Amino acid sequence: MSIRPDEISTVLKDKIANYESQVDVYEVGTVLYIGDGIARVHGLENVMANELVEFPGEIYGMALNLEEDNVGCVLLGEYSHIKEGDQVKRTGRIIEVPVGDDLVGRVVNPVGEPRDGKGPIEATDFRPVETRAPGVIDRKPVEEPLQTGLKAIDSMIPIGRGQRELIIGDRGTGKSAIGIDTILNQKDSDVYCIYVAIGQKKSTVAQVVDVLERHGAMDYTTVVAATADEPAPLLYLAPYAGCSMGEKFMHEGKHVLVVYDDLSKHAASYRELSLLLRRPPGREAYPGDIFYLHSRLLERAAKLNDENGGGSLTALPIIETQAGDVSAYIPTNVISITDGQIYLISDLFHAGQRPAVDVGISVSRVGGSAQLKGMKQVSGTLRLDLAQYRELEAFAQFGTDLDKSTQQKLARGKRTFEILKQDQYQPMPVADQIVIIFCATHGLLDDLEVEQIKEFEKFLLSYVKDNEPGIYQQVETGEKISDELEDQLKEVINKAKEQFKEEKELTG
């Protein structure tokens, strides 16, 4: 076998000409300490704040503390196999989450991984979890209503699209129920919903998802679940991730509702991270930037102007108080950031007044301008009537002889409170609310027994829809009620009342 030098040289030249060097360049560091979900890493000289870093076994962490000689990272997964001396790689990416239509109807964790067993999420669009809130010039005033379907809220504490309305109260007063009812009420509207569960039991989240599925609400809802057994960094990321998913729709000119359930646990998870990273503690051991934690989240709720698509993101943050103390650190912070609060009290809840809204301390600072004209008109005196009733009720407990007008106010107050009661998962269309609140504020329920009110409410609404659809359609527009329509409504309600009483006598 003869070797031909010219052939060898041709092959070598060809190989050299087509040689491509593939060198992967990483900036790597070394683990100095690992424990309690925190890693101290040396050598990541150019790492960015909040950058994603990769640990062995495809476990990711987030760089939170950039110190002189090391980086404090929080780990976003199981870290028992990571040890001192392991290599850590920079990714050059800030934490992002998948966004878009692929997430609608899904249950995901705060980094966008599916948790519902329905297969992978094929999202092609991603957004950083932390983004800047829209500027003053990009916004417009809140002017469109967001109906909750709850009479007590839509009449006295109206919420507008783009508003931030805090739901605050003790444990077990029905805070989550208001958030879920509001999501259920968006069924026939154009609002996408995102429910962010922070630090809740898996069984509770499963129950919420089941309710949403049974009522057909998962067709327009995404659930972001960071359950109680997840590491603190995931609980910390959850609301920002949910907000980013909503912002995608907002910037497309659509409308979004985000329920954060709840920000008390979110603050506790951030306190845990901060103390483990040895940041100096302040009041109630929270770090100094705890206000900024929530303000930068809630400022992302906005109503964009027409040049930016006119989309909106409405936020309903939930805060749990201890023994009704709204003057604690986190409650006062969030009250000052939001555009109003719905305050729920346990006394009303246990007395059977559900939703247990305290109308005296609850307020909506911007929602009034978004309220439907018809609702504004019929519920104008409602808050005052209820406040007077509460005062007189306390006075009447002394057993004093009361004059006729006081007795009348007490009787009307009882009936008004009765119509504001509502069962869970039964949001009411706004036209139904206007009709029934019209009855209360015009004294048309005064001659009925308190026990008959709920029954009469159902009877009246079906009577109006069946016998006077024209009147119902006029009310449905939400426009101001004319004198003529007011007279027609009174006439229809009185007819319905007569028929109701006759039927009662026959069956009684």
UniProtKB/Swiss-Prot annotation:
Main location: membrane
Record InterPro entries: ATP_synth_asu-like_sf, ATP_synth_asu_C, ATP_synth_asu_C_sf, ATP_synth_F1_a_nt-bd_dom, ATP_synth_F1_asu, ATPase_a/bsu_AS, ATPase_F1/V1/A1_a/bsu_N, ATPase_F1/V1/A1_a/bsu_N_sf
HAMAP family, per the entry: ATP_synth_alpha_bact (MF_01346)
Keyword ATP-binding: yes
Protein's cellular compartments: Cell membrane
Biological role: Produces ATP from ADP in the presence of a proton gradient across the membrane. The alpha chain is a regulatory subunit.
Site positions (Required for activity): 362
Cellular component, GO annotation: plasma membrane; proton-transporting ATP synthase complex
Quaternary data: F-type ATPases have 2 components, CF(1) - the catalytic core - and CF(0) - the membrane proton channel. CF(1) has five subunits: alpha(3), beta(3), gamma(1), delta(1), epsilon(1). CF(0) has three main subunits: a(1), b(2) and c(9-12). The alpha and beta chains form an alternating ring which encloses part of the gamma chain. CF(1) is attached to CF(0) by a central stalk formed by the gamma and epsilon chains, while a peripheral stalk is formed by the delta and b chains.
EC numbers: 7.1.2.2
Catalytic activity reported: ATP + H2O + 4 H(+)(in) = ADP + phosphate + 5 H(+)(out)
GO molecular function: ADP binding; ATP binding; proton-transporting ATP synthase activity, rotational mechanism
Protein name, entry field: ATP synthase subunit alpha
Its membrane topology: Peripheral membrane protein
Keyword Transport: yes
Binding residues for ATP: 169-176
Keywords: ATP synthesis, ATP-binding, Cell membrane, CF(1), Hydrogen ion transport, Ion transport, Membrane, Nucleotide-binding, Translocase, Transport
Membership in a protein family: Belongs to the ATPase alpha/beta chains family.
